[in-house]
């Protein structure tokens, strides 16, 4: 009998084209939507982390080769539908919508109903989304991360003791939301202005951290425990940004400089770095993965400090998986560099989760 797999997802609503001259700096998301999508400027990044039909269809097609798939949109009907269908396990790519614990909603509902699920548990999902709490745990566990504070008001930013330059971002958002060239603050006036803007825009605390001027990398991790492994490292090619632009992959790079007619080829995989640095990057990524007790898969963002030492920036236990190779979706890019097709990636992740849940190989059951 085929394994019954429930796919939990959030479907991105249709949105009008982005008007010419739009300048909202909060359009960016954890990774850019596909090139066909432009967000509604009335709610510029509210749904930025949700998936388009093409992504959901691609995941369904891949999972259908290893089981019977049930689509479970993670809306208000999700708990009742999950209780009714009761799949053998849930493959979770749902990001949630409201609150700092939104990425924990689906796994928490699964646990409440006793339905096994893939990827990290509610605690890990909540901690990873709260950048301040995640950095506290990383620091306590000795995982390298930049010095930081969490500011709840402009007054706290004004009293910050960290040396400039500093980098600021919302505490509870995906890695791109609220990140722009204005996030790099070189003096107290810029810092207070940007912190004020982010608090007013997102109604949440702001992480203020030492700016890391070195190379930036993304590491895709698969597996659990000692079997956790890194896929080829992705490097950020900041030399592809316009002349004079600061080395920041934020709103401007995702929405202004990267266009369908002139793609910004900023990702390089495998990254062109020395073997010793690559080993340090992988070690830092795995240390962070284990410190937050991630499961099955995760993406870890890393940037080097002024001395060239890798520092963990943040973790994403619900990484994006856009199927179009032209899109900047890191996990599929890393998988492709490892010789895996998109379907191979999704099947492998499902197999990793099913082995953890049942002790059996999902791939072997359909062989």
PLM region spans:
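ATP-dependent carboxylate activation and anion-phosphoryl transfer catalytic cores
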Residues: 137-142, 272-367
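ATP-binding N-terminal substructure of ATP-dependent carboxylate-amine bond-forming enzymes
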Residues: 1-118, 123, 128-129, 140, ...
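Short, flexible, mixed-charge acidic loops at enzyme active sites
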Residues: 19-35, 246-256, 324-328
């Amino acid at each position: 009998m085929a394994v019954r797999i429930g796919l939990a997802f959030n479907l991105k609503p249709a949105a009008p084209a982005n008007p010419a001259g739009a300048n909202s700096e909060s359009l960016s998301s954890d990774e850019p939507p596909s090139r066909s999508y432009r967000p509604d400027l009335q709610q510029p990044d509210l749904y930025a982390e949700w998936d388009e039909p093409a992504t959901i269809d691609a995941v369904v097609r891949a999972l259908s080769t290893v089981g019977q798939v049930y689509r479970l949109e993670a809306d208000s009907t999700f708990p009742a539908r999950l209780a009714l269908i009761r799949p053998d396990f849930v493959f979770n790519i749902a990001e949630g919508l409201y609150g700092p614990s939104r990425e924990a909603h689906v796994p928490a509902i699964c646990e409440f109903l006793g339905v096994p699920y893939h990827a990290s548990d509610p605690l890990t999902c909540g901690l990873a989304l709260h950048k301040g709490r995640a950095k506290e745990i990383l620091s306590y566990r000795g995982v390298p991360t930049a010095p930081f504070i969490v500011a709840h008001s402009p007054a706290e930013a004004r009293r910050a003791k960290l040396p400039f330059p500093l980098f600021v971002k919302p505490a509870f958002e995906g890695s791109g939301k609220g990140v722009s060239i204005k996030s790099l603050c070189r003096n107290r006036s810029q810092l207070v202005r940007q912190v004020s803007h982010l608090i007013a825009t997102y109604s949440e605390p702001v992480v203020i951290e030492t700016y890391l001027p070195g190379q930036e990398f993304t590491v895709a991790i698969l597996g659990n425990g000692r079997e956790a492994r890194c896929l080829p490292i992705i490097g950020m090619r900041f030399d592809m940004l316009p002349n004079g632009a600061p080395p920041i992959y934020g709103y401007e790079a995702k929405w202004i400089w990267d266009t369908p007619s002139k793609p910004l080829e900023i990702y390089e995989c495998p990254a062109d770095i020395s073997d010793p640095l690559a080993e340090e990057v992988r070690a830092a990524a795995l240390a962070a993965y284990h410190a937050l007790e991630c499961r099955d898969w995760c993406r870890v963002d890393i940037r080097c400090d002024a001395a060239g030492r890798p520092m963990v920036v943040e973790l994403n236990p619900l990484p994006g998986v856009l199927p179009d190779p032209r899109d900047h979706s890191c996990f599929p890019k890393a998988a492709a560099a490892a010789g895996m097709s998109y379907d191979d990636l999704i099947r492998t992740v499902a197999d990793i989760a099913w082995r953890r849940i049942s002790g059996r190989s999902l791939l072997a059951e359909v062989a």
